[in-house]
Amino acid sequence: MYVRRLELVDFRSYERVGVDLEPGANVLVGPNGVGKTNLIEALGYVATLDSHRVATDAPLVRMGAAAGIIRCAVVHEGRELLVELEIVPGRANRARLGRSPARRARDVLGALRLVLFAPEDLELVRGDPAQRRRYLDDLLVLRQPRYAGVRTDYERVVRQRNALLRTAYLARKTGGTRGGDLSTLAVWDDHLARHGAELLAGRLDLVAALAPHVNRAYDAVAAGAGAAGIAYRSSVELASSTADRADLTAALSDALAAGRTAEIERGTTLVGPHRDELTLTLGPLPAKGYASHGESWSFALALRLAGYDLLRADGIEPVLVLDDVFAELDTGRRDRLAELVGDASQLLVTCAVEEDLPARLRGARFVVREGEVQRVG
């Protein structure tokens, strides 16, 4: 799989730009702040419907414009598919696949499989659990796009259930009875248990498959600096790490029943996949709080490379993007990383100084300036 062409209209700093890309290595060179990351952010958005930099869509649309448009031509197994997304702040995005409008924006998921490593990924190691849950769920959707719907359904149930609990909490706090009716809570418990079990099962399967890839990737990047491990820690008691849906549904139902009083007292849902954690370890110690800056950077990179390797093991050949990575690495780690990714079907690399790149990665070369991208090699 590779992206043959990317076009942006009123996206971030670009009023209009088009870039023809090549299979193999593509290097985007330019000073910081000229828009290199905006280009790869657009590709990441097509792959995940999320930005790796901001939580909402509004900053993606160029100031003063009503909407931003991303178009990319994706070639997979000899066939080209045009994917288009129109981002309208405050409204549902519109999408097209080929010549046909998509019923929902999320229908484009799976058209472009892409793994992106960026400086923000340091938060995978140092940040809060939500960062690691998002990492798992994004990778889950890349492997099996149907999980986008599972995640959306689960998040909707949590919002509805939280609204009910919050209303009851406020009513009781003020001594009133209006709004304190919890008669429908059992219905939302059932929905949460079913949708939560589906999401939890996917995550457990993913972590089991991913763990050996993480250890191998960290060893390759950090050159024997220690064993890297990952494990899934659920907010409910699980009989085993297996992903049997019926058992997981029962476990979630039991946990919701046991925690009902505490949830009413706090006005929020305290158990479920939205409260779970992906734990990261280096040797016997947790990576968060103990890993050095270099170790944290290598671990974050290993998580992305592991996802890339897992997709390839599944028979998926994703696009790999490395945003401003090599400037953070010493010469030895640069060369080892180049060895790991040199055979990617398509690799996009951004850098401020081309000399930071190992020679084997210097493929098609583009210079990025304010508002324009020019191929120079």
Curated annotation (Swiss-Prot):
Molecular-function GO terms, alphabetical: ATP binding; single-stranded DNA binding
Record flagged with keyword ATP-binding: yes
Domain of life: Bacteria
Binding locations of ATP: 30-37
GO-annotated cellular components: cytoplasm
Stored InterPro entries: DNA-binding_RecF (IPR001238), DNA-binding_RecF_CS (IPR018078), P-loop_NTPase (IPR027417), RecF/RecN/SMC_N (IPR003395), RecF_2 (IPR042174)
Subcellular location: Cytoplasm
Regions that span the bilayer: none
Presence of the UniProt keyword DNA damage in the record: yes
Example GO BP: DNA synthesis involved in DNA repair
HAMAP family: RecF (MF_00365)
Family classification: Belongs to the RecF family.
Protein task: The RecF protein is involved in DNA metabolism; it is required for DNA replication and normal SOS inducibility. RecF binds preferentially to single-stranded, linear DNA. It also seems to bind ATP.
Name of the protein described by the UniProt record: DNA replication and repair protein RecF
Taxonomic lineage from the root: Bacteria, Bacillati, Actinomycetota, Actinomycetes, Micromonosporales
